Structure formats: structure tokens, C-alpha cells
């Protein structure tokens, strides 16, 4: 199944239900993300951008409203349905990165790629070189800087087919040069797949030419 659209309909984190929240183009509204388009979701700290990404990925369900994939509610999706979406339709780079600190950078990447068989060794090596961390590929992830870890996690997120890629503050610890390189790589992969990009930011955003900027 190809995933052409993701819609958040009347969605609101339950923790916000009893609170007065600022005007939002997503919370308590209807927002649709379409395959092939790129979106920047800007938010203030604590505005719920990480929650939004986790809801779309099915990692959390503590929200009011509806999450729709191709117009179909995800409310009753079982684990098998979610696993299928995560393996073939939605790639995800979480803000907390979720790397195994005792494994090397390359081992973290290969752990995922071993499950998908998606990216060739040469492609992975090319990404490592372009992002300036090839010389650190055999270092334990826990000994790398946060910016280096962010680049490792980005490469790992690309080791699968996808219709959408969710990027939660993907360049918060990168300088402008590495930000641009990361953006180029993401754009190349998304374009090759005809995929959509949903990137969040509280300030330092991924340097893409976005089709739409939305305020959370």
C-alpha cells in the first residue's frame, strides 16, 4: 500500500485538553500532509512537536481527535498494521535519536539496514563521507558528540523505503554546512521515492525549500 496522505483531524495531546493553548494550524484543526511535498512544522519549546511525530509514527496514542492515513482512521490499527507502515511507509528520526551507545556508528546503521536490506554498503559509506563522519564510523555512538550522533541517526533513518519521512529537530546540533549536506541527502532520497518530508523545528531548521510552513 502506498501512503499518499496523513491527516490530523481535531488532534490535541490529552495533556493540553484542560489548558488554554495558542492558535495552532495543527492542534484542534485539520492538517493534511501529502506525499511528494515538504513541510516545516515550527513550534515553541513544549508545543508538542515531538508528540505530533510520535502520534504519526504510532509510538504514542495519548491524544484526542483522529489520525488518518489515506483517509482511513488509525484508531483500530493493530501492531501488525503499524509495523507494516513503519517498515515501508514512514521513516522516522526522533529528537532523542535512540542510538545504542555501546554499538559503533556503523553498527547502529547496519542494525536497521540488516532488517530492511535497503541501502547498499557503498551508499552508506557515501553518506558517512558526505556528512563528515566516515572517520568515526567505528567509534561507539556513546562517545560521539551529539551532532555526530544526529548524523548517524539520520543515515539510519534513510535505510528503508518510505512515503513520508518524519524528522524531529533533525539539525538542532549541526552547523550550517552539515545542515545543508543533510538537507541535500534527505531531498535526494525523498525525490527518488516521491516521498513527503515533515520536519519540525524550534529554531534551527533543516535548510530545505519547503512547500509549506505550518505553525504548531
Task: List where the protein language model places each region.
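Conserved ABC transporter NBD signature motif
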Residues: 65-75
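ABC ATPase NBD coupling module
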Residues: 74-91
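Catalytic Walker B motif of ABC-type/P-loop ATPase nucleotide-binding domains
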Residues: 165-169
